[in-house]
């Protein structure tokens, strides 16, 4: 009996101590206003795990869609949170009348910027873009169907070679078109698909400086208005007290050094938010660029 009582007392003490330890941790949940599959779900869980490693009490709150997320934000749950949103998602939310206002208080910091790339087939000889274009009067460029026809006009003016867009639905089909020899070049997001496809050679990115030995587009095409464009995601604040905002912003920026997030960003050469000056301005600029193509 004595042993049983000791075990019960020990268990109660452990439970109480655990509760106190948890209570000492600052709370910062991660809401995910999307399906439980795909990139947003994976990133949300990745971030929550990293926040726990950093010393936060963090849980994933699956709100599933924008309207639910907006309703969650209006409640006093007692648990501050963040969610990650891209410029494209922001525009889509607005178009569906699910308005989640971005202010200086709710825009915490940029999570990352994913860059664009331009590629050729790897079996084609390539030294520089100038040599590749030499002697050509026209080149075709595989790109997503959502881009406007005139996106490459300034490239044509700069190089004297006409860049003609060929539309495809999805990056997988863009690559297929290039590999099949249907186009001379391709222009798309720089993801693990592009990096991992050995039949293509992605020779440049829209990063502001050289990454992975690739000369930046701002050097190859200095007059092109999209030479530094890319997909930007930011952290949006959900009911974070005013006196905690500065600390949360600093901690979110430091997540780029987390043991899981750092390699996640590095494998596709994404630029972490902590390395981006004027993150809000960069995000707003990306929104403007997307809207100008519609």
PLM regions: where:
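Flexible hinge/capping segments at coil-to-helix
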Residues: 120-138
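A structural signal for short loop-to-beta-strand junctions that line the ligand-binding cleft
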Residues: 98-117, 140, 218, 222-225
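Secondary-structure junction motif
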Residues: 142-153
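Bacterial N-terminal signal peptides that target proteins for export
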Residues: 1-9
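C-terminal lobe and pocket-closing loops
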Residues: 113, 192-257, 285
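Bacterial N-terminal signal peptides
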Residues: 9-18
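An extracytoplasmic/periplasmic, membrane-proximal ligand-sensing/linker region
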Residues: 24-28, 53, 163, 243-294
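N-terminal (or domain-start) structured segment
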Residues: 22-104, 147-148, 158-187, 192-196, ...
